[in-house]
Amino acid sequence: MPRTQRNDNFIDKSFTVMADIILKILPTNQKAKEAFVYYRDGMSAQADGEYAEALDNYEEALRLEENPNDRSYILYNMALIHASNGDHEKALGLYQEAIELNPKMPSALNNIAVIYHFQGEKAKEAGQEDDAENLFDKAAEYWKQAIRLAPNNYIEAQNWLKITGRSEMDVFF
């Protein structure tokens, strides 16, 4: 049974009904509508912690979806799952693909920076200072890009950039 038919709380049911109405009235082709159904089911499964099911749905949505912007969000959600499961390399690749399709996605840029920062901390703990600094520099570059796109967000990153001397004043204004 499709996930959309299993929603058992009011909010999920309401969202499903509204999404179905929108799908019926929007002038999109059948393939795009099917892609959206898989994407919606993927988001629902992801919210429930059913990551394997979510990835299956996202894969199918990605196969069907042709719109680059929509594909970027599918890739982004897939990356979130891989990152939360500790597969940072896979997540980085998916975030990069998402950014290639949608360069103005600050959340993907931020998440890449978070992964590089995490890896930098691990390298530092292992006594690999040069590797740590390189990873921190990568994190800084991605955070700067994210902050340029969303200057009111990522306050902790802005503070980290200032504290570590990795910021330029024009980034924040």
From Swiss-Prot:
This is Photosystem I assembly protein Ycf3. Transmembrane segments: none annotated. The lineage of its organism: Bacteria, Bacillati, Cyanobacteriota, Cyanophyceae, Synechococcales. The gene is ycf3. It comes from Synechocystis sp. (strain ATCC 27184 / PCC 6803 / Kazusa). It is found in: Cellular thylakoid membrane. Keywords: Membrane, Photosynthesis, Repeat, Thylakoid, TPR repeat. It comes from the Bacteria. GO terms for biological process: photosynthesis. One of its GO terms (cellular component) is plasma membrane-derived thylakoid membrane. It is a peripheral membrane protein. Essential for the assembly of the photosystem I (PSI) complex. May act as a chaperone-like factor to guide the assembly of the PSI subunits.
